[in-house]
Amino acid sequence: LISAFDAADADDNVRAIIVTGAGRAFCAGADLSEGGKTFDRAARPDRKSAPLRPNGEVEWSDDAVRDGGGRVTLRIFKSLKPVIGAINGAAVGIGVTMQLPMDIRIASADARFGFVFARRGITPEAASSWFLPRLVGLQTALEWCMTGRIFGAPEALARGLVRSVHEPQDLLPAARALAREIADHSAPVSV
């Protein structure tokens, strides 16, 4: 995803980006079948040593210590193009947190959302504790994160997580129409 956003930002012909899932899910989250090793940096094949500051402290802001979901989320946030999330199905864990920095989110009536971290004994990832309250308010963000429950598109719409809900077959046409409206009616330097 990072490479795709880099390419889109570098292409002046790209005026908007639509992110959706393949198949029935938007993104069902991390594969937790490895148990604790799922989040063990030392077990990752792409592991890098954490860089140090001159005073010997770890440079925590560097990509070497940021989790993969955090890097993707930050890249989406930094995108130079408007980003539309077309949430077509299950969006749990990183699947729900990666959509938070998207400029506009629309959902299929079949979409399901879940900030399930508390139920898994892990902390919310990818700056979701920063993005989520800004989108839905502190009370809703706390409820969703503390209960870890799965909720549907109607609740996501009512609480402001998504802009609109569409029948599954109408989701991508709606996302494309929105992208086209942005591209046709906004100067490239204004959005």
What kind of region is each of these model predictions?
Residues 1-24, 37-38:
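Conserved CoA-thioester-binding segment of acyl-CoA-metabolizing enzymes
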Residues 9, 59-60, 139-141:
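Short, contiguous strand/loop micro-motifs
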Residues 15, 190-191:
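C-terminal capping/lid region of NAD(P)-dependent oxidoreductase domains
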Residues 21-75, 91, 121:
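Glycine- (often His-adjacent) and acidic-residue-rich active-site loop
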Residues 74-188:
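Crotonase-fold acyl-CoA enzyme core
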